[in-house]
């Protein structure tokens, strides 16, 4: 029986062995009485050689007409050849065409196409080598996170997506009809994770989050994957240590397992190798001083947007923290700084090279009255948060947590020019199809 192999398994060590390959045509070139048919699958690309005197006139003519992305099965003998990808090729003896494609809508080099064309044909674009590489890196980052979290004693939980209230501001909620009332798509699992810490202490989840923001920047999506952690008995400094250790492990493990894919996007891996903790830490006050010294028009109390964060990242060659933000620009659930009531115990992790915030975290307010007052100050209805307030009535403890935007991390690791390429089917204010 002929052994079916993947493209990545075709190596010089298989010299003389008969194999079967199933995949899609990546490129097709006729040279005299031979056709060089490059076939790809999920693992790589293999050069196959179809000779007219071996397969016959009919099969040769059929092979000559195969366009990119035609699906085929070939059988043949492995031959070592240092000019071929992987150092070996397959001399074809049998070709089965599953479906012939005459013209594929995406150019052979997708970078020659407009972003809009690639997004219109996203269902086809994701099969191209670089798009596939992005998804492999993304899955590996998540796998690495799971490894680290399991080893460090964190429990994975599965919070709801349909919710009754806002976590990050009511203006960015997607509202939908829920039988005889209204519900919203979750902006964050945080509040539910906070409930889970009283039984499990250290919890995490990976869920989609939704933000109805009409932001048209290179780092915003309306739907994204959110890796969130919450822990009892931790203060802000404790949770920052967790963040840097987790991100460091995710990046280093992915470098170990997906170096080939990362090198499709990065010539220099120095910045990624520079993720050993501890990461630098600067206060919000120091950040304002740095920005003002560079001529940026920003005042104490202003939020740090993409432009300000980009300038700050020029000061660092690795991820870093900005901590101690003004209360007025942060969420209601963040704990007030006991040493300065103008501030909250919050920290953002920013990625270098202009990528900015990838994690937002804080110590949570654990006092019932203070949390209730913050909800009222924000103009929200305490009834929507009755259950959340209950957590401060029955054995409340100091606790902290954070959320990591998975696509933002992927975008930085691969130096992508836009976060949308880190999403399988990106959702933006202008894009809901396909």
Curated annotation (Swiss-Prot):
Pfam families: tRNA-synt_2, tRNA_anti-codon. The keyword Transmembrane helix does not apply. Disulfide bonds: none annotated. The keyword Phosphoprotein does not apply. It catalyses: tRNA(Asn) + L-asparagine + ATP = L-asparaginyl-tRNA(Asn) + AMP + diphosphate + H(+). CDD domains: AsxRS_core (cd00776), PhAsnRS_like_N (cd04319). One of its GO terms (biological process) is asparaginyl-tRNA aminoacylation. Its EC number is 6.1.1.22. InterPro entries: Aa-tRNA-synt_II, aa-tRNA-synth_II, aa-tRNA-synth_II/BPL/LPL, Asn-tRNA-ligase, Asp/Asn-tRNA-synth_IIb, NA-bd_OB-fold, NA-bd_OB_tRNA. GO terms for cellular component: cytoplasm. Keywords: Aminoacyl-tRNA synthetase, ATP-binding, Cytoplasm, Ligase, Nucleotide-binding, Protein biosynthesis. GO terms for molecular function: asparagine-tRNA ligase activity; ATP binding; nucleic acid binding. It is found in: Cytoplasm. Belongs to the class-II aminoacyl-tRNA synthetase family. This is Asparagine--tRNA ligase. It comes from Pyrococcus furiosus (strain ATCC 43587 / DSM 3638 / JCM 8422 / Vc1). The lineage of its organism: Archaea, Methanobacteriati, Methanobacteriota, Thermococci, Thermococcales.
């Amino acid at each position: 029986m002929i052994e079916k192999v993947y493209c990545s398994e075709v190596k010089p060590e298989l010299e003389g062995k008969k194999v079967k390959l199933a995949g899609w045509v990546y490129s097709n070139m006729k040279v005299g009485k031979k056709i060089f048919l490059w076939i790809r699958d999920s693992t790589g690309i293999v050069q196959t050689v179809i000779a007219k005197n071996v397969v016959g006139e009919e099969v040769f003519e059929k092979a000559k007409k195969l366009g990119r992305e035609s699906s085929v099965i070939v059988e043949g003998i492995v031959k070592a050849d240092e000019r071929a990808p992987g150092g070996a090729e397959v001399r074809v003896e049998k070709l089965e065409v599953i479906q012939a494609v005459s013209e594929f809508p995406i150019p052979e080099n997708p970078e020659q196409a407009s972003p809009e064309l690639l997004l219109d044909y996203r269902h086809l674009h994701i099969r191209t080598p670089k798009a596939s590489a992005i998804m492999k890196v993304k899955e590996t980052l998540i796998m690495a996170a799971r490894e680290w979290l399991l080893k460090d004693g964190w429990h994975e939980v599965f919070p709801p997506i349909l919710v009754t209230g806002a976590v990050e501001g009511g203006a960015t909620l997607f509202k939908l009809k829920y039988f005889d009332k209204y519900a919203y798509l979750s902006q964050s699992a945080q509040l539910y994770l906070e409930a889970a810490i009283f039984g499990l202490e250290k919890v995490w989840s990976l869920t989609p989050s939704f933000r109805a923001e009409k932001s048209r920047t290179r780092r915003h999506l309306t739907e994204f994957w959110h890796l969130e952690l919450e822990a009892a008995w931790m203060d802000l400094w404790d949770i920052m240590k967790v963040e840097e250790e987790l991100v460091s492990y995710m990046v280093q493990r992915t470098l170990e397992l997906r170096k080939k894919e990362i090198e499709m996007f990065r010539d220099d891996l120095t910045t990624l190798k520079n993720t050993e903790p501890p990461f630098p830490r600067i206060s919000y006050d120091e950040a304002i001083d740095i920005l003002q010294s560079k001529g940026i028009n920003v005042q104490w109390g202003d939020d740090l947007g993409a432009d300000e964060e980009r300038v700050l990242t020029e000061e660092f060659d690795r991820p870093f923290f900005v901590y101690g933000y003004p209360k007025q620009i942060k969420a209601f659930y963040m704990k007030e700084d006991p040493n300065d009531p103008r501030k909250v115990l919050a920290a953002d992790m920013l990625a270098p090279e202009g990528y900015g915030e990838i994690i937002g975290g804080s110590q949570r307010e654990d006092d019932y009255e203070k949390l209730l007052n913050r909800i009222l100050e924000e103009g929200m209805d305490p009834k929507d948060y009755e259950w959340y307030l209950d957590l401060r009535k029955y054995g409340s403890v100091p606790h902290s947590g954070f959320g990591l935007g998975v696509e933002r991390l992927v975008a930085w690791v691969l130096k992508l020019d836009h976060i949308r390429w880190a999403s399988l089917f990106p959702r933006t204010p202008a894009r809901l199809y396909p």
